[in-house]
């Protein structure tokens, strides 16, 4: 259902801080042409935390419109209030989204039982396939494999995006949840190793600007051609790392603008544009990846 290179899409903004839908359409077309396996609209990289509900819904619906059935679209629907996460998921009922990506509740630090009940409530409210999203570095809570296993027993909880970077969890989760439960890396730097160990793909920041390379790399991995995939991975490794020289999505939006993929690199406060001191680092990573001369 979900595999390969799925992009965690940036949300392009104009200089007034409004969504730039012309650039969004160009990005969707770029990913279709590059062979990207799916698009996550309005996730962390899409600045979900600083979008209004109206903007959030419109962004997902416009992404679906621009995709026009040519590529699966996954809606970011996470919230730290369960009723809000349920509402978001229900808003996309019959919309055509392939799934919902729901981050663990952040800031309020629920227990493992609280996390289970949170996702159970979402699961019971909608038939849309749900992807759990564990990123403790941002949320201050860790969705443990044992809790994932409980959730995997629910009908429409089908996948996990694991952004811990802990490769030992792949085998643990596979053992607890079975091989049919989809595991997606949320960490570009370790994603290929994640797949080697039994994962199914990646929800990627790097793919925003190196979509064809990422799609090719994970297609090779799916064929067991890991040596060929690793050649691409090593070339992209500076990008994997340096796109986090400042908080995501600051560097990747700057890089997308530098490559002419979006009209502006604007980002909403409290995030600010990439600092002058960090720009040479990202520029060099683009050159190392072969994206700039």
Curated annotation (Swiss-Prot):
Q: Which E.C. number(s) belong to this protein? A: 4.3.3.7
> GO cellular-component terms in the record?
cytosol
One Pfam short name? DHDPS
Q: Name one GO biological process term.
A: lysine biosynthetic process via diaminopimelate
Active site at 133, 161
Q: Which reaction does it catalyse?
A: L-aspartate 4-semialdehyde + pyruvate = (2S,4S)-4-hydroxy-2,3,4,5-tetrahydrodipicolinate + H2O + H(+)
What broad class describes the main subcellular location of this protein?
Answer: cytoplasm
Q: Which InterPro entries match?
A: Aldolase_TIM, DapA, DapA-like, Schiff_base-form_aldolases_AS, Schiff_base-form_aldolases_CS
Q: List the residues marked with site Part of a proton relay during catalysis.
A: 44, 107
Q: Where in the cell is it found?
A: Cytoplasm
> Which family does the similarity line name?
Belongs to the DapA family.
| Record NCBIfam families | dapA
Its name, as the record gives it, is 4-hydroxy-tetrahydrodipicolinate synthase
Gene name, Swiss-Prot/TrEMBL = dapA
